[in-house]
């Protein structure tokens, strides 16, 4: 008995494999929808042996995963693995229902290899949400600041007030983060280590630390893959080679948090030899910054790992 779930902001498309048959239904991605999903599963006589699987995309899967975890085994899988499975199965078309069906099939075929999802601890969740909201506020402030440059006189004062309010909230969240670190010395030690990396500030340190503590990464390759910063080469047959690009199959929010640190590292010539080699090869600045983002992620992982092994 396997349940594949394709999660979006507003809906969850479900495919239940039971007794060799597929049963498909769409629900709202909210508590009412979760209850209707439970009723539907009970109608199909599901037991605690049901294995549920969804992709780790954004934040929209989290409430559902918490809910299902109370009753069933849940796996939250890296989208890259699902995509690789789809390629192997030669699935070319893409709809939400087909995605749910594919995830259910993946769950059935890989059942012995899948790891059960474990909800984050309270401190992991707190750090993650503080870091996430701090990023949200900073984005809002940046948007309003851009508007201010072109705003007419009768609108500018209102925008300035909004910016001041956002700045005040940002200061409050930063204070909460500092209080969190005081209450959790282990996190604080790791945070200080991360901030020794040129370009890594409070926000990016919090984002990297929350990701690192949340998932049991075995090596730096897994960590960069989780961030979607692992290189992927487009190749067709044995003779046609495309350009190498990052996979982008990973946590976009965390990847985004490394952009400004990469800009700072670039301006400070932290990786001058590395950057010069890329420039000689004719690489554009965007690709160079992405390469620096990956370097920062690797350095961060190794710093955190060495701290744990002390």
Predicted features along the sequence, with ranges:
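Short glycine-rich phosphate-binding loop at a beta-alpha junction
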Residues: 49-60
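Conserved small/polar residues in nucleotide/adenosyl-binding loops
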Residues: 308-310
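Phosphate-backbone recognition surface of nucleic-acid-processing proteins
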Residues: 206-281, 285
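Short, glycine/acidic-enriched loop or turn micro-motifs at the edges of active sites
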Residues: 9, 58, 81
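Nucleic-acid-processing active sites and adjacent nucleic-acid-binding tracks
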Residues: 20-47, 51
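Gly/Thr-rich phosphate-binding beta-strand-loop-beta motif of the actin/hexokinase/Hsp70
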Residues: 1-17, 103
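Structural signal for membrane-spanning alpha-helices in multi-pass inner-membrane proteins
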Residues: 263, 301-302
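Long, charge-rich intrinsically disordered scaffolds of nucleic-acid metabolism proteins
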Residues: 66-69, 75-193
């Amino acid at each position: 008995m396997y349940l594949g779930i394709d999660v979006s902001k507003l809906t969850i498309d479900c495919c239940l494999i039971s007794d060799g048959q597929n049963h498909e239904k769409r629900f709202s991605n909210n508590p009412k929808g979760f209850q209707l999903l439970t009723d539907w599963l009970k109608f199909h006589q599901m037991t605690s042996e049901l294995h549920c699987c969804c992709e780790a995309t954004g934040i929209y899967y989290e409430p559902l995963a918490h809910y299902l975890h109370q009753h069933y085994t849940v796996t939250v899988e890296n989208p890259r693995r699902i995509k690789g499975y789809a390629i192997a199965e030669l699935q070319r078309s893409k709809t939400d229902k087909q995605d749910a069906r594919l995830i259910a099939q993946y769950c059935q075929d890989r059942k012995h290899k899948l790891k059960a999802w474990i909800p984050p601890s309270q401190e992991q969740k707190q750090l993650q949400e503080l870091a996430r909201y701090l990023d949200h506020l900073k984005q809002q402030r940046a948007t309003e600041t851009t508007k201010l440059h072109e705003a007419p006189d009768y609108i500018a004062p209102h925008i300035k007030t909004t910016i001041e309010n956002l700045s005040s909230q940002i200061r409050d969240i930063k204070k909460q983060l500092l209080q969190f670190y005081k209450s959790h010395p282990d996190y604080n030690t790791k945070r200080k280590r991360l901030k020794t990396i040129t370009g890594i500030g409070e926000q990016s340190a919090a984002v990297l630390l929350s990701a690192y503590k949340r998932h049991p990464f075995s090596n730096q390759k897994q960590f960069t893959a989780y961030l979607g910063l692992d290189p992927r080469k487009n190749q067709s047959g044995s003779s046609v080679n495309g350009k190498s690009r990052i996979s982008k199959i990973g946590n976009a929010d965390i990847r985004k948090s490394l952009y400004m640190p990469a800009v700072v590292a670039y301006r400070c010539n932290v990786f001058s030899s590395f950057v010069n080699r890329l420039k000689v090869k004719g690489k554009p600045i965007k690709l160079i910054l992405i390469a620096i983002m990956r370097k920062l992620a690797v350095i961060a992982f190794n710093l955190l790992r060495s701290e744990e092994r002390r």
